[in-house]
């Protein structure tokens, strides 16, 4: 009997030991899972946050070109040349910010065919076709202004009268223009329902009239690379501000 009691006691101790060991192993498993699961979750969050954003595309339209010189400045500068130079500077500015840029023209070559009867209309249609093909997020057409009174000056942005996004983009660029020019620029954004590009553009488009070639002081400035770069920077900053506000950047 004594031997039986001893054996029973040993069996009881063994069972207790096994249970304690099992509990210990279970606790280790729970602790290890508690450690591994957050790490896996964190890794997943990090992977999601590194998904690259969609590359944005901005179309830049340098107005006029080839046989169409646009306005001729009081100092004989040609609008088409100033438009192209400013557009190139805007392109350079935006590309440094990671924006994809498409231009309707990068030199003075015509956008129409020599056989086209209405070359101006063919030119406008070609610009619209480029916009359609590149599927840009927004479009900015660069021009210079003119008026009968030489005293009138200052940059101004036009947008399509029924375009909510166009109005926002115009306001953003106009604000940037005002910072470049200063308080003396009293011009404000203006709706329009007649300009061909504004009416037919498949995306929000604005027309930036960068200054008046009929104003001697402004015409001289617009012919200089330094001022062209300042105007281009204002356009670029206005574009970036609009894209940021619309949560596209």
Protein language model features and the residues they cover:
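Catalytic-site microenvironment of enzymes
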Residues: 1-249
């Amino acid at each position: 009997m004594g031997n039986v009691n001893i054996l029973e006691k040993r069996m009881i101790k063994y069972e207790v030991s096994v249970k304690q060991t099992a509990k210990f192993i279970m606790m280790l498993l729970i602790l290890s899972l508690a450690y591994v699961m957050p790490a896996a979750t964190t890794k997943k969050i990090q992977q999601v946050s590194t998904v690259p954003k969609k590359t944005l595309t901005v179309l830049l339209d340098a107005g006029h070109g080839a046989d169409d010189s646009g306005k001729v400045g009081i100092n004989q500068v040609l609008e088409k040349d100033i438009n192209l130079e400013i557009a190139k500077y805007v392109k350079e500015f935006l590309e440094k910010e990671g924006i994809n840029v498409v231009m309707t023209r990068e030199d003075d070559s015509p956008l129409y065919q020599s056989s086209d009867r209405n070359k101006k209309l063919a030119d406008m249609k070609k610009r619209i076709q480029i916009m359609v093909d590149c599927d840009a997020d927004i479009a900015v057409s660069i021009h210079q202004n003119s008026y009968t009174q030489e005293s009138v000056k200052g940059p101004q942005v036009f947008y399509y009268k029924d375009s909510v996004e166009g109005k926002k983009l115009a306001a953003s660029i106009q604000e940037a223009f005002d910072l470049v020019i200063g308080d003396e620029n009293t011009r404000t954004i203006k709706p329009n329902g007649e300009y061909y590009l504004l009416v037919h553009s498949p995306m929000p488009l604005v027309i930036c009239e960068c200054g008046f070639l009929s104003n001697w002081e402004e015409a001289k400035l617009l012919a200089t690379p330094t001022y062209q770069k300042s105007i281009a920077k204002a356009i670029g900053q206005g574009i970036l501000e609009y894209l940021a506000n619309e949560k596209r950047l």
